[in-house]
Amino acid sequence: PNFKAILLIRHPLDVMVSYYNFEKNKTNSRFKGSFSDFIRNNKYGLEAWCKHYLSWKDKSVMLIKYENLKSDENKQFMRINNYFKIEIEKNKFKKAVEQSSAEFISKIEIREKKLQTFKNVNKNFQFVRSGEINQYLSYFNNNDMQFAKNIFEKYKIHEYEI
């Protein structure tokens, strides 16, 4: 293709946790089930994530994992610079990283409610949560984990281990 793009992915099981919390806090959510129901739902669940991911995977895009970005933002920054053939001053990069952190954005959201652009969410809903990795471990039971493994095998998703 005649474009360059970055595909930023996060562990799909952590995505399910975040998406579930978002849906449960919408005042007009059409989803009313449990977390286990959510990950199995055709519209919201793991299969939908896999289909979306696979629709981008084979395009000429740079793949960046959220987890790698959190663990070594400097390395990922250099990869992005090289991919787009751009140079950004280190101090500007450092400031961008600081101002993109979940903690920084969460503070802004609390202080100014600027990120509260969703009209149909509960009043105290906070869109930016912790941004922590492996939150799914406290949400997925053994049956959910087996379901996820089966879905990953079905769609040949090998970027993350379960």
Task: Label the predicted regions.
Residues 1-4, 57-61:
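Short glycine-/polar-rich loops that comprise or flank the Walker A/P-loop
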Residues 4-19, 148:
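Conserved phosphate-donor/acceptor-positioning beta-strand/loop module used by diverse small-molecule
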Residues 6-7, 16, 29-38:
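A contiguous catalytic/ligand-binding core that recognizes phosphate-bearing ligands
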Residues 7, 51, 71-79, 143, ...:
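Generic recognition of stable, solvent-exposed alpha-helical segments in well-folded globular domains
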Residues 16, 49-53:
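Rossmann-fold NAD(P)H-dependent dehydrogenase/reductase core
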Residues 20-23, 27, 36-43, 53-57, ...:
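PAPS-dependent sulfotransferases, especially Golgi type II membrane carbohydrate sulfotransferases
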Residues 58-84, 107, 135-139:
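Phosphate-binding beta-loop-alpha motif at adenosine-nucleotide cofactor sites
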